[in-house]
Amino acid sequence: MEIFDILLSTILLRPYVFLLLGLYLVAGSFQLGLKRILVFTILAYFIAFISEYTSTRIGIPYGLYHYTGETHGKELFISNVPFMDSLSYSFLGYFSYSLALLIVSPVTRKGWEFELSHPSWYSKKVLFLTSILFVLQDVLIDPVSLRGSRWFLGQIYYYPVEGIYFGVTLSNFLGWFLVGLAIIYSFQKLDYKMGWSREFAGNALMGPVLYFLNMVFILSVTFYIGEYFIGMISLSIFSGLIILTILKVRRALSISAK
């Protein structure tokens, strides 16, 4: 009964995370298949948890930071790490992976549906691009999360030594790149070994749309709490990425019209 209560409390405390998680599972099931997206989720969670566990103790890979424990008893913790924090890496990783696949792979259109033709599931280009896109999400997220006391997130963590990027350490972004690399590399290797991949992948746009919707949410919070300078930098990152994505989709539309 206690486990049920804490799970319910976690959902009520982090409804936006569960909403993104649900949308991620739907999008991922359509694009990768249910088996692959579940494997992706498990891989991402365990890699993320290990990275957070070690960083809060020895500062690797993100640099040293600490969870405040403010939400202890209100949400599920695994050791000193909030369960939902590590779990969020799964959908942030997939959103980045899906956008990287869209940018790199050939795109075809059938009516209103866009699909990837011969997706670059295992390419190094997708691996590194995903990791970069993964970091760029955190460039928007972390400065706002660090100011969680000013919105409904709460002050859930802090850096003992204030970082150069609006309080966030540069080692944090390096850590996100390495963890993103580890998640996608592990998934690519396992996916290839098990032979689960598909020659075509439908639902090519839902993952990228969710990538940008998450950014819109973070941008909204950034401006809501009055961090306009951070917001303008984040908005420029968002704008550059969405323009690149729109150009790729327009190219697919023009090819299908010929």
Named regions from a protein language model:
Residues 1-258:
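Aromatic-rich, lipid-facing transmembrane alpha helices and their immediate juxtamembrane interface loops
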